């Protein structure tokens, strides 16, 4: 049986080196991370170099694996521009165990501060950054016992991480990513992760996976607000009905009510603040792509603690969730879809924050607010079909 053909990485396969000029001075802070035990002083691969290589790979669709990354290190172009030397496969694989992702996270946050939300008069009344929160699953190449999970919807075994993401929708940037095992239970449950990471003065936009009175109470106590989609089976006690305006009706709002949710007999924790239930007419649908996911009966039910905003604006805030879905689509292409360079927790967070930085660099260099067309253009490029589209 013939052996596998060695895949060659050429100069033209490596892209994005010019875009990395802005971030390299920031990466230089990482040089000493993980060197505390290197008493002999013979370390050849440092964290700033490793992160530069990961960033380069995310700009280069041809680099699909750690072995491809190793071959790219042998190119004079890469060694000269990034200041790296040849690295062994073992060094690239094992070095992440001593690299702390926290300093890289700080760099991503600092870079994010340079991207400002563009004024949007429609949402000015919100008075808080609008933060869509959701999670996406990325599979590991190797099977890792502690990451083992069999989701009911798919019915197949997964070894994967869940990346819990906070996405500032008006500026188009992810501001936080936390990696946990994919199974949504215990400390890895999306509601538990968000409750640990709540910040003050934010407007959190949440899907049905974040239904939790305890979580909503915590968000309210932190001085933040939320707009969360409720279950189709939500039952509420109406205490006041708000009159709909013409703008509300034009936005397909059916009802706007102040409500009490929950019963002491069923719920350990009850809401401790005023809540509002807004119903919006939408197109009914079955489970997504034939999977046993939640259906929609034609009414979108939104729960919020913002009693001051028009109902139509609450509906528009929730519609902004499409941005994080498009971000995940692009983000997964940056991560190579199912290909993570490392199955170690540190390595996954480093790669996730590098992908986050690349998305920010795209925003900085294009100078445009993200929209569907921009995300689709980047997505086509990353899957290698942009060139064929241009030729056609």
Label every PLM stretch briefly.
Residues 150-151:
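Short, positively charged patches
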Residues 75-83:
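Blade-loop segments of beta-propeller domains
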Residues 1-68, 72, 85, 96-99, ...:
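Single, function-defining residue in the core of a domain
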Residues 113-120:
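A short, well-structured juxtamembrane/interface segment
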């Amino acid at each position: 049986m013939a052996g596998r053909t060695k895949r060659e990485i050429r100069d033209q396969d490596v892209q994005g080196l010019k875009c990395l000029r802005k971030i390299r001075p920031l990466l230089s802070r990482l040089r000493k991370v993980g060197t505390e035990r290197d008493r002999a002083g013979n370390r050849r691969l440092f964290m700033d170099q490793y992160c530069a290589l990961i960033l380069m790979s995310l700009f280069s669709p041809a680099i699909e694996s750690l072995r491809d990354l190793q071959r790219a290190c042998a190119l004079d172009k890469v060694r000269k521009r990034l200041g790296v030397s040849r690295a062994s496969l073992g060094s690239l694989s094992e070095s992440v165990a001593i690299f702390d992702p926290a300093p890289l996270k700080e760099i991503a946050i600092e870079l994010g501060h340079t991207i400002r939300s563009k004024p949007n008069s429609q949402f000015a009344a919100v008075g808080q950054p609008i933060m869509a929160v959701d999670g996406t699953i990325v599979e590991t190449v190797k099977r890792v016992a502690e990451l083992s999970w069999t989701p009911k919807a798919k019915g197949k075994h997964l070894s994967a991480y869940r990346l819990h993401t906070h996405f500032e929708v008006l500026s188009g940037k992810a501001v936080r990513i936390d990696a946990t095992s994919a199974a949504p239970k215990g400390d890895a449950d999306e509601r538990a992760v968000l409750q640990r990471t709540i910040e003050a003065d934010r407007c959190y936009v949440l899907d049905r996976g974040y239904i939790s009175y305890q979580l909503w109470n915590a968000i309210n106590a932190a001085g933040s607000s939320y707009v969360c989609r409720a279950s189709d089976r939500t039952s509420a006690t109406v205490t006041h009905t708000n009159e709909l305006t013409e703008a509300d009706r034009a936005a397909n709002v059916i009802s706007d009510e102040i409500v009490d949710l929950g019963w002491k007999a069923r719920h350990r924790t009850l809401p401790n603040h005023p809540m509002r239930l807004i119903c919006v007419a939408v197109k009914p649908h079955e489970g997504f792509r034939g999977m046993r996911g939640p259906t929609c009966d034609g009414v979108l039910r939104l729960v919020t603690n913002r009693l001051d905003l028009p109902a139509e604006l609450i509906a528009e805030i929730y519609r902004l969730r499409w941005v994080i879905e498009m971000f995940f689509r692009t983000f997964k292409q940056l991560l190579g879809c199912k290909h993570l360079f490392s199955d170690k927790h540190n390595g996954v967070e480093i790669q996730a924050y590098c992908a986050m930085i690349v998305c920010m660099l795209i925003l900085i260099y294009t100078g445009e607010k993200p929209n569907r067309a921009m995300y689709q253009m980047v997505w086509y490029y990353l899957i290698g079909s942009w060139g064929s589209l241009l030729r056609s």
